Amino acid sequence: MLSITNVHKRFGDVHAMNNINLDLQPGLFGLLGPNGAGKSTLMRTLATLQTPDEGTITYNGVDITKEPNIIRSSLGYLPQDFGVYPRMSALALLDHIAILKGLSNKAERKEQIETLLQMVNLWTHKTAAVSTFSGGMRQRFGVAQALIGDPHLIIVDEPTAGLDPLERQRFLDILSRAGDDKIIILSTHIIEDVRDLCTDMGVMGNGKLIVRDAPEALIARIDGQVWTQRIENDDTVDQLKKDMRVLSTRRLRGATVVSVLAAKSPGAGWELRNVMLEDAYFAYLNGFISNTESRHAA
């Protein structure tokens, strides 16, 4: 188990992690939040690339801030931006990474690398330099390097940003096949990634873990409370943002479709619609509802 207790991290006046508490068991956990929420700071801390100012992080009962090698030997990490040796082929680079991870048996390395390259659909490109890969291919290669050594903890940070829909789906399919016996943390600002993949999730904003629960539980929390209306006048939209709990606005054929959170109909012209995960996400992120009725209070 991975246990994060009362963790803080500051960069000058910025409180990047503010009293984070989170326990994770094997399975896929999605961490949603806008850019600047503190997600990458948390991921880098879990990967032992930096230490918290306060609090403890334990992995299977061992404090990783004091004994980082305990988690490093079990970790697969795909950061938001990762560099490669520009002239090395995918095959050679994975072999190099495998050696760094402690896989000394050449035959074992060869078998693992071949299996992973086939799994991420890069086997036919094994002799090509990784620097020549497209964005989607690089991300799939990133998954392969993260899975070398059969890690029990996998951290992926903003993995689908910039990918086209097909590459995004390929990536999520690979991640979903990584194994139910591993703790997999998917940190992203893309709501669909969590919706499509995770059975457990958290919402992070301004350095705090605002809420943690199953996606369907967060959706159920506001069921029957999301109303929508097409508004033609921009001034009316601006006023609604002041007067109501506006979840989202989007332009549609010259007008603005406004979605609001309300326990009952706000009035004439408003229509009740099915709740989506993004509604629950914005409701918690904007402080329209608290986490007190969720399964896991942050």
Give, region by region, the residue ranges found by the protein language model.
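Helix-to-loop junction immediately C-terminal to a conserved catalytic motif
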Residues: 47
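Conserved ABC transporter NBD signature motif
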Residues: 55-66, 70-71
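Conserved ABC ATPase "signature" region
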Residues: 95, 99-102, 107-125
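Catalytic Walker B motif of ABC-type/P-loop ATPase nucleotide-binding domains
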Residues: 154-158, 163
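Walker A (P-loop) phosphate-binding loop of ABC-type ATPase nucleotide-binding domains
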Residues: 34-38
